[in-house]
Amino acid sequence: MNFEQYESAYPPRALPPGAWVTRIGPSPTGKAHIGTALQAVINRSLADGSGGAFLLRIEDTDRERFVEGAIEDLLAALDWLGIRPDESVAHGGAYGPYVQSERLPIYQAAARQLVEVGHAYYCFCTPERLESVRMAQQAAGKPTMYDRHCRNLGREEVEKRLATGEKAVVRLKVPDGTEIAFDDLARGRIAFESQTIDDSVLLKSDGFPTYHLAVVVDDHLMRVNQIIRGEEWIPSTPKHVLLYQYFGWPMPRIAHTPILRDMSRRKLSKRSGDTSITGYRVQGYLPEGLRNFLTRIIWPHPEGKDVYDHEEFVRLFKAEDLPNTGPIVDPQLLDFINGQYLRRLSSAELYTATVEYLKFLLGLHQDIIFETYHPSAPIKQTLTRAELGSFYSAFTANPTYTERVLTLEPERYKRLSDIVVSTGFFFPALFTPADPKLLAKPLGSPEKAGALLGEYLRLYRPDAAQAEWEQSVRELAHEAGVKDGKLFMTLRVAVTGREQTPPLFEVLTILGGDEVQRRLELAAAMPVSL
């Protein structure tokens, strides 16, 4: 088939004027990155806000970098984020296939058409020759570009060499002495001189296209009319401008998003931790919180809000609002925003969300490392899969009890992982008595701690009101000649095994008299020698 025949299978879309057809085109080279999530949120929102359509296209033409399972990871990550494409390999659609490796005949026909009209040419240069040219250019301090050795081969010679089976690629024919420019919706006019643009490969010798050919052909056939992609593609855009001109197609509106940066303003990378979408899910972020954060770092709300309903972003955001400088992925801002979404949940909803989160973690079949941001280095805490399993069993054994636990100072929770690492002491099966040194720390000696705990046990009344309970502890401290706060801390450590917890009286109330007494007896009976 020639290209016109393929093109006839992709008619214009029946959409209202001003409707944007957007897309993302990730490559399946590993776990889906948080940058892909940002692109998906932006493009989905622009389509929704205009009554358009949002497509997910898998750009898998670089077979050497293809990672098995990456497509499935991407689909699961977007589904968790609540970003559903209108068309994709999973959702179908009238403009597929949505995987580039399934569209090879289309690209091959497009490349042949470009050659036939003189806008591209066959190149027979071997890898060895290309490497020799590259090294010579580097030695001379020149840009490394193809030297156009095959650009002016005669038609007869080309056909003869192809007929003998000689391997060839198809290269873009870049014009000489021309300015190639485009209007970026967020950055304004960007121009390149044609002598700085390489005669790039469009079709490889194995029949697979490069990004340049595939993305232009697909965006045209799928009727994409607004492209939002990362700024790393700005140097490639003049090649795409030429291709649109050579094919005689209108070029979509285009804007480039800046690269995400870490707190040191370096490009976000693995040194910043796990930057995959799944990695953020592991850390306990809600999809709503992560979506809000991603929109917040690229768009200032008109009223200066950090937290807002996503519908506001969809209604107000335009591609022209995109920033030119790299957004900072600030973990503290993300924690703040996510914490606000957690506080919107009732205790029952928070319980359900935590249970689903635990099921997800257990389904990974691995130990989990929770990370908390610190300027010098992340604070890490590891839970084995066995420990997670034990926590899940205890957490779900009595939902009514667990929901009472979750009502205590919900503002402490910034992520669902905070619940996992901070509430274990509430469950008898998970409680571990404090280290004797920690128990002795407030009062200065294990003997004094043991004696006062024993005395407190004789006074302890589970049914006492808070004021009465506090007064009894203060009187005991006064009689023993110690500060109130030190005795309260000793009781806290004895009952919870920790120095930091929600208000102690509320903890005692939830645990119940029998469990509190059991723990106090354990603490009072600890060896006095350390």
Swiss-Prot record:
Keywords from the UniProt entry: Aminoacyl-tRNA synthetase, ATP-binding, Cytoplasm, Ligase, Nucleotide-binding, Protein biosynthesis
Residues the entry annotates as binding ATP: K270
UniProt-listed Enzyme Commission number(s): 6.1.1.17
Domain of life of the native organism: Bacteria
GO biological process, one term: glutamyl-tRNA aminoacylation
'KMSKS' region, short sequence motif: residues: 267-271
Residue ranges of the TM segments: none
Pfam family, one: tRNA-synt_1c
GO molecular function terms listed in the Swiss-Prot or TrEMBL record: ATP binding; glutamate-tRNA ligase activity; tRNA binding; zinc ion binding
UniProt KW Nucleotide-binding keyword: yes
Motif placement: 'HIGH' region: 26-36
Protein task: Catalyzes the attachment of glutamate to tRNA(Glu) in a two-step reaction: glutamate is first activated by ATP to form Glu-AMP and then transferred to the acceptor end of tRNA(Glu).
Quaternary structure (record): Monomer.
Protein name, as recorded: Glutamate--tRNA ligase
The species this protein was found in: Gloeobacter violaceus (strain ATCC 29082 / PCC 7421)
